[in-house]
């Protein structure tokens, strides 16, 4: 029996709808409009597409969008000065620096210059530490989106065995922390994991975030398991460029109970959760009640 397809595009639209409702309430009840500042350094084509999409969706939910486009040769001092100004701007509740940065800029230094309360990407070392110790933090958008989809599909995740394939600071590690927070038994697997297939076969939940096209075949999947595919890989097949995930979709979908497609699965949730994080940051800054269902 084929797996249930978890429609990330439809789920993201629901999240954006909830965010828009809360933004309208903030405007009407408190005269506050959440603001998201996005900083783009250079002219990387993919980054430009992402920034345009983020700006468009920010405005669509009723927030203010502030785009700062800097030349590729912008100095670190000038970039840090901009971040300092945004940190002090009361109309800006979220700050996102689009990655990757040009090679002469220190990404860690730049990210950690952002006020942790405005770090809507959840990459600041303070937010990493807060998440790791189970405290209130800004949570990275992609893992947050994965968690939302898992909760929506399963309800409670308590007691489930979860395997996260990938140990990046952006997805793998925070994903594991979030699953631990929901009382899963979590294994982080990676390129050095022995008998990776056997490890994955024990999982009720598989989150693939390793960046290798179609690495996970269907015979690695426990029957009925839920598969969350974070990977976005471009491959050449039959003379055409295709987007595929980190799991082999066709074979995994024959075994899994539920699966996210690529495209249309995790991807749309990332920007939706960025908007949710900006709303959360705004409510916290103004000491207002946080909206339900948009934070872990």
From Swiss-Prot:
Its EC number is 1.5.1.5, 3.5.4.9. Catalyzes the oxidation of 5,10-methylenetetrahydrofolate to 5,10-methenyltetrahydrofolate and then the hydrolysis of 5,10-methenyltetrahydrofolate to 10-formyltetrahydrofolate. The gene is folD1. One of its GO terms (cellular component) is cytosol. GO terms for biological process: L-histidine biosynthetic process; methionine biosynthetic process; purine nucleotide biosynthetic process; tetrahydrofolate interconversion. Keywords: Amino-acid biosynthesis, Histidine biosynthesis, Hydrolase, Methionine biosynthesis, Multifunctional enzyme, NADP, One-carbon metabolism, Oxidoreductase, Purine biosynthesis. Belongs to the tetrahydrofolate dehydrogenase/cyclohydrolase family. It comes from the Bacteria. This is Bifunctional protein FolD 1/3. It comes from Ruegeria pomeroyi (strain ATCC 700808 / DSM 15171 / DSS-3).
């Amino acid at each position: 029996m084929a797996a249930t397809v978890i429609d990330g595009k439809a789920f993201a639209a629901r999240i954006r709808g909830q965010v828009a409702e809360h933004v309208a309430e903030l405007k009407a009840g408190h005269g506050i409009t959440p603001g998201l500042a996005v900083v783009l350094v250079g002219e990387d084509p993919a980054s430009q597409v992402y920034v345009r999409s983020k700006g468009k969706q920010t405005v669509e939910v009723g927030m203010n969008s502030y785009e700062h486009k800097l030349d590729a040769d912008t100095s670190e001092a000038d970039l840090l000065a901009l971040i300092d100004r945004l940190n002090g701007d009361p109309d800006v509740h979220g700050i996102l620096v689009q990655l990757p940065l040009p090679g002469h800029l220190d990404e860690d230094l730049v990210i950690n210059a952002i006020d942790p309360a405005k770090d809507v990407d959840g990459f600041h070392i303070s937010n990493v530490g807060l998440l790791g110790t189970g405290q209130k933090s800004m949570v990275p958008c992609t893992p947050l989106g994965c968690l939302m989809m898992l909760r929506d599909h399963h309800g409670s995740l308590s007691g489930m065995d979860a395997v996260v394939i990938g140990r990046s600071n952006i997805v793998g590690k925070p994903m594991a922390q979030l699953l631990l927070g929901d009382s899963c038994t979590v294994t982080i697997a990676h390129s050095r994991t022995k008998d990776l297939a056997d490890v994955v076969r024990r999982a009720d939940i598989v989150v693939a975030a390793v960046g290798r096209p179609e690495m996970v075949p269907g015979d690695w999947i426990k029957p009925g398991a839920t598969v969350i595919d974070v990977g976005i890989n471009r491959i050449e097949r039959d003379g055409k460029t295709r987007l595929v995930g980190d799991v082999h979709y066709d074979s995994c979908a024959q075994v899994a109970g539920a699966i996210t497609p690529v495209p249309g699965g995790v991807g749309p949730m990332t920007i939706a959760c960025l908007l949710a994080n900006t709303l959360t940051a705004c409510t916290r800054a103004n000491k207002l009640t946080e909206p339900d269902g948009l934070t872990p």
